[in-house]
């Protein structure tokens, strides 16, 4: 919950949850009529365990994340801890098992669990660092591969520049 009456969600809540941001209005559609499907906890837990075993996050990605962590510490004075990395090691394999790619899972996770901490900073102070960070992400992970992170960073920068930004 983050609305007009709740100005901030604590780190503890974010660290234990996976936020879903709904920034755009959905398209109207007619859903297909499908029957209910019961899934109990043990079955879902089994699927998660299989996903983690079959799709572990690569050492290459973990190395890039460590380099990124050091960059963020140096330029923004924000660090993320072992709990975040442990959560990422569970989230990304499940993301891959659901049909996504590893880099897209890392991108989604970082944008929602790490970069959201930038909102707590004085954006006037960090605004000049954002372009360098976007370049770093493109250099480290591949041009345009960290699209969620880059979109978030540019939106943050432009909102505080007084510009309205529309990113497609």
Residue ranges and their predicted role:
Residues 1-168:
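C-terminal regulatory/interaction module of P-loop NTP-utilizing enzymes
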